[in-house]
Amino acid sequence: VVRLNDWEYRNKIALPFAYKSKSGRVSLGFYEKKTHTVVPMKWCPLHGEWAATLIQDVTEWANNEKISVYEETSGKGLLRHVVARKLDTLTVTLVVNGSRVPKLEVLARKLEEDFGTVTIFVSENVKNTNVIFGDGAKLVWGREQKQNLGTFEAVVSPLSFLQVNDEVRDAIYDKVCAFLSDFDGDIVELYSGVGLLTAQIAKRLENAKITAVEIMPDATKNANALMQSLH
């Protein structure tokens, strides 16, 4: 695959919440290497400006509305992670140590002001674990939107896998389809996520039979909807 953009290529970001050590204000950032110490950040060169705006909106909301942050040592506090994917529209998932997020409408309105159409999910994770998401994600604001994924449009749920680099994804899929261009047998795609590669192959190789295999319920639901749209 040819080398493409080195910067601002990621369509997804996942950031833990933390309190700043000196000011005590809520921040978002990445973990320091081999620690659970969060290094606050306002911008990341691997993401577009959308991520900087998201970080500002979410941290200002948490600070202004005095929303508590989860602390591993005590097991108390609400906000654990924010996970966001920016395709045609913005999808945000708040991972929380509880079931209810106060003042959610305030955050939603601010995000809509900056991003237009916004979809928000809440994932409850009350376990003492390094895993980001809980067992699922509940839609709490807006509705799931079809996203332009190159050749196809599809809904991508927050727990579904999708390549984080759109350009590299398209380049890889083109090469795979070219490699299989004369193949007319059975093809199995394992860990298929939302089924985007499966759909590409099915469209281009009319004589081949392809089966997608995926265990995540949300991704399977997205993939089935995408396959139905091909008929």
Residue ranges and their predicted role:
Residues 84-97, 153-157:
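Short, aliphatic-rich beta-strand segments
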Residues 8-12, 25, 77-79, 140-144:
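Short beta-strand-initiation
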Residues 70-84:
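A short glycine-rich, hydrophobically flanked beta-strand micro-motif that places a catalytic Asp/Glu
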Residues 13, 82, 165:
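Residue-level signature of catalytic and energy-coupling elements of molecular machines
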Residues 1-71, 87, 101:
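Extended interfacial segments that mediate partner engagement and assembly in macromolecular machines
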